[in-house]
Amino acid sequence: MGVFTHEMEVTSPIPPEKAFKVFVLDYDTLFPKVVPHAIKSVEVLQGDGGPGTIKKINFAEGMGIKYVKHQVHVLDKDNRYYNFSVIEGDVLSEKLEKISDENKFDPAPNGGTIVKITTKFHTVGDAEFKEDEIKQVIQSRARVFKAVEDYVVANPDA
C-alpha cells in the first residue's frame, strides 16, 4: 500500500469556534440544506458523532459518486480538531483502500480561521494515484466549502 499526502491551508472569515461548529458539528444537517446540489443527505449509521461513529454521505445526482461512508477517529471540540477516514464508497474505486483526513481549525490574525487540512490517499497495493485525481477531489471539496462559507457569512445565525 502506498500513501499519497496532500496538505493545504484554507482561510475563512468565520471565527474558529463557529467554523468548527459549521464544518464539523453541524455538517450532517447544514450541508444538505446549503448545498443540496452536491450533498443530498447524511445518515448516522453508528455512534453519537464522536470516535467510532460511521456516517453515510449521499451525494446528489450528477456529482459522479453516489455515496461515501466516513468513520470518525477523533473529534476534539476543545482543540478544534477532527480526524476521519472515508472507508467505503465509489470514490475509493479499485485504486484506493481509504482516504484519511485531518482538519485543524486555528485562529487567523484577522479574527477568522485557518483550516489546516491533511488528506492521505491510501492506495491498494502498488496502484498509482495521479496528481490530477487528487486535484479533482480537493477542488470539489473546495467548491462545497466555499458555498457553505458564503451561506454562513450571509446568515450569521446559521
Model-derived regions: residue spans:
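Beta-strand/loop substructures that line and gate deep hydrophobic ligand-binding cavities in soluble
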Residues: N83-S140
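C-terminal helix/juxtamembrane-tail motif
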Residues: M1-G2, D106, D132-A158
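Glycine-rich portal/gate segments that line the openings of hydrophobic small-molecule binding cavities
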Residues: Y27-L30, K40-E94, N155
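Intrinsic-disorder/low-complexity, polar/charged segments enriched in Ser/Thr/Lys/Arg/Asp/Glu/Gln
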Residues: V3-E9, I39, I54, Y67, ...
